[in-house]
Structures are given as structure tokens and as C-alpha cells.
């Protein structure tokens, strides 16, 4: 029997996703493929900065179960009021013995409108994490009942002027349902959408091992 994906009933959830590098010229074809699917879906476009913060070495000495290569804090704030202006602080934890970034522990906190960016950054700084880098993501998001599929472009904005532009496709299992699935069932959903997106080069062989954090960390 395949292992059950466990989830604590709180703001915490298990993230189960795969990522693929892709040329940005495939965006229109990607959207056409998704639009032709008969399943009910919702589309959202979001863009804006993501600020990444890292823990100091002493923190990992006291929390040896977590891997520095995949444990961090992210502050996300959409531009132009997109996504209803929802801002979010996310703590992501990768186990030290994990072989990939497909399954990670994640804690999400949605912020109130009156919470300022300065307040968030000051609080993160006082908690011990330090700013490491920033990126801007332009995301075309399709939410299905079993997964979310995203085509997004990333710009590195850490030093001001945008550089290092990359594009990716991401398939993430619905976070509210993944805890009730076996790992085999979760992989079946990933494979289903890989087959759908195979015309633009999305397949199991193209799954990336590194997270965005590992790609852009300074």
C-alpha cells in the first residue's frame, strides 16, 4: 500500500508540486492547451514581487531536521491590487533527508490590509531571518479541482534592475485534498497534466530538482 501524505489540521499543509523550465514563447500555446480542457477551471493573473529571507547558521544547528537549501521565509505582495491584494508570508521547510523539493512543509499567513510592508520586514528581521533576494513573478494561474497549473516568468530584482529572466510551468496538487491522497494518487495527477502539456515539452524527464529558492539564493 502506498504511503499516505500526512497533513496537520492547521494553517500548515504539505506542498506537492513539480516544476519545469520552459521557453516563454510557449505561453500562448500553453494557454490554448489549457483552455481546451473540458474540466471546470478558474483563471487568475497575478504579478508582483516575492521577497526571500534566510535563517542564520545557528538556527539550523538548533533545528537539525531542516535543510538550509530549502528552508526559508517568503513575503509575497501582488501588484496593482491583483489577487484581491492578498499579501502572504510563507514559511517553507525542507527535511534534511529529502531527495527533492516535490514535498515540503509549508505554513501560510495571509495579512490584513492595514499591515504595512515595513512592519512585515521589521518583524521578520527581529525574528532572526535576513533578506537574501527578491524576484518578480508574472503568473498565469489555472485552478482545477485536483491541481493548480501555472505558467510564470521570473525576473531577479535583488540589485534593482531586473535580470536573469526565466520561465517555468508548475503543477501543484490541490493543497486541501493532497492530505487525503496516497502518494501514488498524487503522482497520477501530476502525470495526467504532464501528458496534457507534453506538446510544449512538459514531461517527467524535464522535472526540475531545484526550487526557485535554490536557483536565486545569494
How would you name each of these model-derived features?
Residues 139-172:
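Charged, well-structured binding/catalytic surfaces in domain cores that contact anionic ligands
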Residues 27-29, 82, 160, 178-181:
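Intrinsically disordered, low-complexity acidic/polar segments
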Residues 175-215:
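Mixed-charge, glycine-accented linear interaction segment located at domain edges/termini
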Residues 2-147, 202-218:
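N-terminal strand-loop-strand beta-hairpin
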Residues 121, 165-169, 187-190:
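Hydrophobic, well-ordered secondary-structure segments
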Residues 113, 117, 135, 160-164, ...:
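Short capping loops/turns at secondary-structure boundaries
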Residues 20-22, 172-175:
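Short, structured patches in soluble enzyme cores that scaffold and shape functional sites
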